[in-house]
């Protein structure tokens, strides 16, 4: 297996170069912790001893080389969940995720269109937001 030799970022993507001189990249939306991190925190990484992973100790984030090599979705900002959060930017992703019992990172991937929620999960998200709306009306 190839080994990671270099890591860098631009405004929307994270890149790796391997010892085989191949370059791979993924959108930062695939890694919400890195997307929200400062440039300084993004640059504070260590390539693992075997060259197959990257660790950001200050962010408690790890990414394996296979995350760059898999056929995975690019961001799709035109999805239903993204449109809801775009229309209501005051929504707190962490709190909405907590209210439906999922990880913030997973909800972020739904918002960015990196992962697609099942119809059941989409309904759970919408129902949670409807509940919030009813609570706001009751004030």
Task: Give residue spans per PLM region.
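Motif-centric detector for short Cys/His coordination patterns
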Residues: 1-139
């Amino acid at each position: 297996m190839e080994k990671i030799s270099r890591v860098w970022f631009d405004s929307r993507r994270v890149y790796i170069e391997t010892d085989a001189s191949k370059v791979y990249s993924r959108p930062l939306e695939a890694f919400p912790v890195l997307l929200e991190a400062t440039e300084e925190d993004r640059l504070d990484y260590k390539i693992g001893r075997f060259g197959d992973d990257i660790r950001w100790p200050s962010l408690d984030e790890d990414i394996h080389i296979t995350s760059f090599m898999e056929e995975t979705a690019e961001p799709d900002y035109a999805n239903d969940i993204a449109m809801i959060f775009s229309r209501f930017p005051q929504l707190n992703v962490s709190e909405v995720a907590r209210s439906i019992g999922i990880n913030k990172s997973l909800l972020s991937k739904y918002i960015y269109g990196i992962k697609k929620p099942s119809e059941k999960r989409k309904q759970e998200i919408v129902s949670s937001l409807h509940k919030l709306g009813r609570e706001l009306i009751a004030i």
